[in-house]
């Protein structure tokens, strides 16, 4: 994580009716499950699933876009094959029920969740086992529906691990990190819910906002984020948790099959800035079924095709991830 750590840190008729109300409210009508589990990716009314089509454009949207790069192309930071010897994207694993938990020694222990993490033998690590990058490890425990995420995770050789930070998320809950706390991501957000997955694209629908990075952020966070990763107070830099929406003028029909659901999601749910990194880089899960040539066509979409939006109307409480519909 490119941080500058400023602080250490849902079948009855009634259910069908509720689903219809959710659609009318601008929230998702269903809770897609984590593949291989019965776990939903947070409740359907969680901020990740909120629709932002009607969110107002910020008055300084142009400045924010220019800071990220108005002429820079959109990038799928995921795909098939290898890059520098590692899978392209951020992998995750559904661990076996009862997977033993191991102790993790955290650099930012005051903002990390203790209690042990169910790290399997030879877990999938972002960038590969030999990577010196962000080295995220994402694990889903399928019986309790708990998501465990680590940043900068390294084995110690004695069965224990060390990591920069870690967060444990109840996927059945809208609980958030304490304000000011990081997670395994700079913004204090969960990572897995914001990743583009092949199974979603193959099904033709991504029902959530997409995790995105920017090269320069400011010393601020906006709900649902809880942590910043910069010392700059420049108001024209995005905050952690800043939301960008793809303009409706971008026609997904002009793009190949694997790209269309991504474009629709960016117009419907938008992108959330979760870390410092490269301009307009979207995060996703590596999968050998990705067609990298199709994904590269996303570069035709430029920063100027985005607007920065005000997502504050979604918030019910700053310490909850539950979102309310926009007018």
Which ranges hold each PLM region?
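Short, surface-exposed polybasic-aromatic patches that bind anionic ligands, especially phosphate groups
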Residues: 32-327
